[in-house]
Amino acid sequence: MFNKVIMVGRLTRNVELKYLPSGSAAATIGLATSRRFKKQDGTLGEEVCFIDARLFGRTAEIANQYLSKGSSVLIEGRLTYESWMDQTGKKNSRHTITADSLQFMDKKSDNPQANAMQDSIMHENSNNAYPANHNAPSQDPFNQAYAQNAYAKENLQAQPSKYQNSVPEINIDEEEIPF
């Protein structure tokens, strides 16, 4: 099954950082996101969604260091269902996001150290790469911000793979490609 969540929103509270017995960092953030729509009567409506997200490792520590209530972030991860019994024996449940990566969405700050973290944090805990056409112009501000911050690094070079020499090179003329 495919379980992937991408959400842009603002923090509803400061980052709550804890350390697990193993010494690894774990953080919880509250995220608010909204959707605007036109109602049947023609008036504009807004629907707000509040959800918690879990961050782990270095991503949790960086979030704690650079984010605060009101900060805008993009989170990629998976939807997780949590259930527990409270002290009265009542069963509770909720959905949360377990983050694989995080990206700051606020304007670049005057702090160069924060800017460096903003440029690199997205792929901290994720090996995923999206084959998006990030060079194509877009009118959607979300896509523009995502493309500029995540994929505008033209100077990055791929890490050499130990399998790189085992794949034969295929010499095909572009005229032969059917699409």
Curated annotation (Swiss-Prot):
Gene3D superfamilies: Nucleic acid-binding proteins (2.40.50.140). Keywords: DNA damage, DNA recombination, DNA repair, DNA replication, DNA-binding. GO terms for molecular function: enzyme activator activity; single-stranded DNA binding. Pfam families: SSB. A motif (Important for interaction with partner proteins) lies at residues 174-179. Plays an important role in DNA replication, recombination and repair. Binds to ssDNA and to an array of partner proteins to recruit them to their sites of action during DNA metabolism. NCBIfam families: PRK08486.1, ssb. Homotetramer. HAMAP family: SSB. This is Single-stranded DNA-binding protein. It comes from Helicobacter pylori (strain ATCC 700392 / 26695). The gene is ssb.
